[in-house]
Amino acid sequence: MVVSAGPWSSEKAEMNILEINEKLRPQLAENKQQFGNLKERCFLTQLAGFLANRQKKYKYEECKDLIKFMLRNERQFKEEKLAEQLKQAEELRQYKVLVHSQERELTQLKEKLREGRDASRSLNEHLQALLTPDEPDKSQGQDLQEQLAEGCRLAQHLVQKLSPENDEDEDEDVQVEEDEKVLESSAPREVQKAEESKVAEDSLEECAITCSNSHGPCDSNQPHKNIKITFEEDEVNSTLVVDRESSHDECQDALNILPVPGPTSSATNVSMVVSAGPLSSEKAEMNILEINEKLRPQLAEKKQQFRNLKEKCFLTQLAGFLANQQNKYKYEECKDLIKFMLRNERQFKEEKLAEQLKQAEELRQYKVLVHAQERELTQLREKLREGRDASRSLNEHLQALLTPDEPDKSQGQDLQEQLAEGCRLAQHLVQKLSPENDNDDDEDVQIEVAEKVQKSSAPREMQKAEEKEVPEDSLEECAITYSNSHGPYDSNQPHRKTKITFEEDKVDSTLIGSSSHVEREDAVHIIPENESDDEEEEEKGPVSPRNLQESEEEEVPQESWDEGYSTPSIPPEMLASYKSYSSTFHSLEEQQVCMAVDIGRHRWDQVKKEDQEATGPRLSRELLDEKGPEVLQDSLDRCYSTPSGCLELTDSCQPYRSAFYVLEQQRVGLAVDMDEIEKYQEVEEDQDPSCPRLSRELLDEKEPEVLQDSLGRWYSTPSGYLELPDLGQPYSSAVYSLEEQYLGLALDLDRIKKDQEEEEDQGPPCPRLSRELLEVVEPEVLQDSLDRCYSTPSSCLEQPDSCQPYGSSFYALEEKHVGFSLDVGEIEKKGKGKKRRGRRSKKKRRRGRKEGEENQNPPCPRLSRELLDEKEPEVLQDSLDRCYSTPSGYLELPDLGQPYSSAVYSLEEQYLGLALDVDRIKKDQEEEEDQGPPCPRLSRELLEVVEPEVLQDSLDRCYSTPSSCLEQPDSCQPYGSSFYALEEKHVGFSLDVGEIEKKGKGKKRRGRRSKKERRRGRKEGEEDQNPPCPRLNGVLMEVEEPEVLQDSLDGCYSTPSMYFELPDSFQHYRSVFYSFEEQHISFALYVDNRFFTLTVTSLHLVFQMEVIFPQ
């Protein structure tokens, strides 16, 4: 059986769908929420996993301790900051409490002052009415007594107004005594009743002031009437009354915030802004409880804020750390979250900083306000104390008038005087209680009172007598003192008319007024003494500075530093002339001057300045004014070791022995031996004025009659027209510290001394390192030998930057590969010895030398050029080799001329690496065969020398000398050095001696004249003797051997060829030139016998000089 169901109807289907939808909607919303939460959790989990993986990957475990430590420090820092903020809040609260209490106290004191001022003015008016009665009859008798009683009542009321509450018992006792006195007097009963009724009205004015000085701030058990303030001068305290329930520490903090300053401000300078009244203990407790109640919720709120802040700070720190890590690994998906968290952290920090600044500013304002109120309170308390003292003295004075001991004295003129005194006391009281803005009114009232007192009928004698016999009233006269001292310029009565007595029972001996009054009184008591002293000093005339200082030290009392330095110790018109030099007058050390002026000597110079010329003290600029027309020129070291008067002085004038010409800072490293200079100067006084060494006055010397000396001497000295350098320096300085400039040589000083001793008996010694040659006048000296002529630098030389003596750096070979150190002390000794031989005839000495030269070789003074000075007028022309052995006058001399026997020519240390090209030499010799006269090797000067009658010398001698036509190097050097130290420069050549002899024989046939005759003559002379060759000496040229024959051919060719490119120095023959046996050269020349036969007569040289240099 088949069952068939029909379809649902459309309505039923719709109903079912709607119901299903309604059921599923909340499930769908719930599922969506769950999905969102799950997605967020998944994201956070992914983030945490990513950070964990990164930390694990980069071994982040090592940084855990560091992270914890940093977070712990951060938390501790936050806690400290929060504690500091709480402390500031508590301090601010205490300041607020203090400010409120001070405001109330100020208000009460102001009110009391106002009431006291009104009462004192009414009392003053009452007494004025008594002093000037309209009806004379009423001023006598009973009416006067009543009026005086009324004045006493007013005075008592004033005392009550101005008295604090702790004096209430004393005031009541005083009032009882006054009542008894009034009852005893004849005053009617009605007056007493009226007075009592008026006294009872002062209830509010007699209320107590809150703060007590006698007990602690928390003691509140005593009744209200016993809690009073005592305004004492020494102890003024602004104690805050705090609740007993509040902690004692807080009370002490409130008390110790600010110390109360003493009474320093003016009593009349009262300007008040805030006013406050005193609080009783109950009121104080109420206020404190209210404040505590208000502050408790604030404190709880602050604590909660602190906890929230701490938690937020920790979270922010952690988020910042995570953000930094994510940023480091470029986690892009978390950028928004990172920015948000960092922005919150920065905003939080800015808010906290702004809050702290606000609290600090508020606290500062409260502090300023508290200080101002403290000062104002101190002034008001001082004013109240003074007014209270004045009112008591006035009250006692009126009581004395009311109860006279002798009735006769209370009548008449005496009564008028006492009433005038009472009026004066009342006026003084009004002044004490008045603020500054009432000063003008008080002055007008005072003027009126003074006029009334003058109009009274009291005779002058009684007033004077009364001034002497005023009864000793302790407190009133203490107040009287300050009435006259309160403005000595404002009061009409003189200060001296008041008799002052002091009692020490209750009040201090002097009333402390304003600081301005105290300072003015100090000025009054201190300044007149000084003024009188100044007047006496002005009458005596101007005092010297020393006396003035002594008088000031003896007479002027020691004041405060402020007054001591606020006035000039010397009158203004005396400052410029009487200030000593020890003051800041010569404060030139602030202007680059480091000198100490001899003050005593300068003062003595100032005293004598009127009668004689002012002597310039050392280190003074007055050196510019000195005149020295007759002073002879001293040696240069003396001349330049002292500052000249015409020098353009610098900013610092320094003593003589200083580095005035700081030449060691300007290319010079010399230390001047001043003691040696002084010794040298003393020696020069007995001699002729010597040439100032290294002086610029060499330019001014004239030698009109000097004949032409030997060219050597003429040219061996620097000309007067030389362009001298910038520096003149003494001998014994460190100028020639040549050991610092490439020096490696120490001269044999013993040999030098020995040579110097030998020179003393011979010709004139050559002053080494000296320029005094310019001063020696030798009018009859004939022309010297040619070698001497050419061995000296010409006057046309281009001199270098420094003109210096011979052995010095003048020929700065030391700066150009020179290594020798001069014995300067020995040079000075030689220089002094030369002065005794200055201008004597040198012919005798030369003749003696010539006689001695026959048996010995003439000594060569090393490092000297004075050989040029020897006169040999009759010397004949020397042999041609001697002619050529000297450098020609036409040589282009270098910048340096140097002595003969130095180690200048240690060319093995120079740049010699020469290998002679023998083939080139042979080729050059063959080319010469077709030319004119044979060119002697090592010489080019044969082309320039004209020798019409000179006999031909031996050819080997001719060639053994360097030519004068050579292109000379930078230095002219002596013969006997290590010129040919070629074995040290790896020159390993062997000369073909046979070839050289062959070439030499071929050249002998081409001489200008017949050289055979000369050689034959020389050979005949050489058979009997061999002339000695003194090594390292240029004087070989002076040995006379006129008949020497021609030398051997090997001697001829033992000299280097003329085509050699000569190095920087000409050197002596007897050097290590022939040390070729060390370099496998197998020829030994017989040098001692046949090489140096270079002696000729003097006549030959004279003839040669006349030919070459005709005059």
From Swiss-Prot:
Subcellular location, principal: cytoplasm
Localisation: Cytoplasm
Coiled coil: 70-130, 341-401
Compositional bias segments (type: Basic residues): 831-849, 1000-1018
Source organism superkingdom: Eukaryota
Domain Olduvai: 165-259, 436-528, 529-600, 601-692, 695-750, 751-843, 844-919, 920-1012, 1013-1111
Pfam families documented for this protein: Olduvai
Keywords: Coiled coil, Cytoplasm, Repeat
Assigned GO CC terms: cytoplasm
Biased composition (Acidic residues): 165-181, 530-539, 550-562
Tissue: Expressed in a neuroblastoma cell line.
Positions of region (Disordered): 161-198, 451-474, 510-569, 829-871, 999-1033
Family: Belongs to the NBPF family.
Note: Encoded by one of the numerous copies of NBPF genes clustered in the p36, p12 and q21 region of the chromosome 1.
Name of protein: NBPF family member NBPF9
Species per Swiss-Prot/TrEMBL record: Homo sapiens (Human)
